[in-house]
């Protein structure tokens, strides 16, 4: 996939993170990501969640998903769309319950928040609401 190596940025939008992880494995994309250290991965919703080790059962929607495991390229999990209007299940209380079950470091972030990972440096960039869980 030469075009992939020529890309400066990959924008990966939402959906189901387990489905996305499945097809990233099937297509071989998961093996290409580490060979592209200069390429910026911009994940939106499931596009970010797919890079984490787990998404938690709360976010698994794909019926064929064997579990809640995703790619584990970063070492933390993400609860997206915190306090999103019209999504009554995405509260901070739900995020705390989710984080207690995830078994590792995690972040709950709203739609005005991003997490950057450069090498081993993780930073939160936000004009909104977020919380870090260290479990």
Predicted segments, located by residue:
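C-terminal and late-domain segments of enzyme folds
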Residues: 9, 55-135
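A short, aliphatic-rich alpha-helical micro-motif
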Residues: 4-5
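Class I SAM-dependent methyltransferase SAM-binding "motif I" and its flanking Rossmann-like core
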Residues: 12-88
């Amino acid at each position: 996939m030469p075009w992939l190596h020529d890309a400066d940025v990959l924008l990966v939008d939402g959906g189901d993170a387990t489905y996305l992880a499945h097809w990233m494995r099937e297509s071989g994309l998961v093996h290409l990501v580490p060979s592209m250290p200069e390429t910026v991965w911009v994940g939106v919703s499931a596009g970010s969640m797919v890079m984490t080790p787990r998404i938690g059962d709360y976010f698994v929607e794909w019926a064929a998903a064997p579990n809640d495991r995703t790619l584990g390229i970063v070492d933390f999990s993400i609860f997206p769309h915190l306090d999103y209007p019209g999504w009554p299940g995405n509260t901070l209380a739900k995020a705390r319950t989710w984080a207690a079950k995830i078994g590792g470091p995690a972040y709950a972030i709203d739609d005005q928040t991003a997490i950057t990972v450069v090498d081993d440096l993780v930073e939160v960039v936000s004009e909104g609401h977020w919380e870090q869980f260290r479990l």
